[in-house]
């Protein structure tokens, strides 16, 4: 097993060298006069150097970081020493805030390259990657994008040097995915703003500063009237109340923060907060998908190595067909996740730097699918790795137990898999209602519509697409029959009327995600023909998954929605009494 997490990862190198359209990324990021070959060579050298450090220094500390966990002494919360040492090395390499502009001390790297670095870190130790991404990268990116020149000069160089660590505080005890319920307030007093409220589940919350989402327009509600604010902790300006005791990413402090008269400065203008935080959330969801790839890669490599060494019944266990099937499923998950996620990362660069409107629409379509597939896939890959290891899989020295534990947070934070499903299906239904005729053709997805039928791979992907479109047609038909043809003319519907779609959103998302993975691997196989068997395997899986989900929707007996209606009525009676 190579200790260079870039050059030693054949699938990642193949994607970098032969699949990712770097010339488009370079032109978008650095302008049409730049030299793509020279720029990409520089990026490759950075990743190779980082991959060597991560493989030789960060990965060996992972078990110890997990064992020690967060340090809680004398009322303070801090990272443990192995974690600190790993992050110190990254800062010394100039990789604390690799996406921040070079003129502010950052690496000036595009989103795609930054995500490759994130994947390697997550493979080595997910907790360390969380601290790096949320503690340094995210605050710097938000301040660069929305802060004043003064705020940029004050904070970004210090974040980029690793002198301070920040966080992004959005979640509250009563406001998780339902952001509009937050109650933390910001009140203008002279030249500054005063924050009051509580935040919970804040990754890297032990740092020296934090970006806070708060309500700053009096009388506003929901997602209106929010703002983002920068607060420093120095002098007790806010309190790190505690770090949660958790069984996932144990080395990363997940903190509760208390703001009582906290002085802060605003990023941008009052009322811009939701628009601003949405950019962070969408990029973070792609980032969490990338985390899933790193964890799945680690689990897959351990399983492959063990299956080649462990002999049972006279042969290595990888030669037993059921074990081989598990290993091939893991390979498909990892390569499929990686191919789809970096397609989305490239689109993000084209949309963000190149102002490409079609890329923006495409990455919006892919983002919830990447978050869903890569994180659910990571859990599945870790579960398979545990099974391949048998009894020793639950022994700490084999690491797969840590991978399994850490993977479980991935489908939860930055929007659960179910929230991603609602997002994906909401946009899909908008597209269908704009163009109902798409349901008698190749469907509303432009990317899925370009699948060619000239081979078995294409036929399987087309069948999966047809199953997904048929599922949409079935669900929409139920709603039309119950509520009238006005639905197709944009009539507003209640949550109760949308029940069939809300119930089956995750099934539909699973079908769409698998179909997109098969499509992306098929397009990759055109560039790298050796990848055709892998793409065909993914296409067969997509066809089977979409058929299963279509049947599940067809056989729905309505009992779940009946139960929901009963609980809704019970709540209504309780509220009236």
Regions found by a protein language model. Give the residues of each.
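C-terminal amphipathic alpha-helical interaction region
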Residues: 450-577
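Internal maturation/activation junctions in enzymes
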Residues: 83, 135-136, 147, 152-184, ...
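Amphipathic, small/basic residue-rich leader segments at the start of a protein or domain
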Residues: 1-129, 154, 158, 558-576
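Internal helix-loop-helix
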Residues: 51, 80-153, 157, 161, ...
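A short core secondary-structure module
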Residues: 192, 196-238
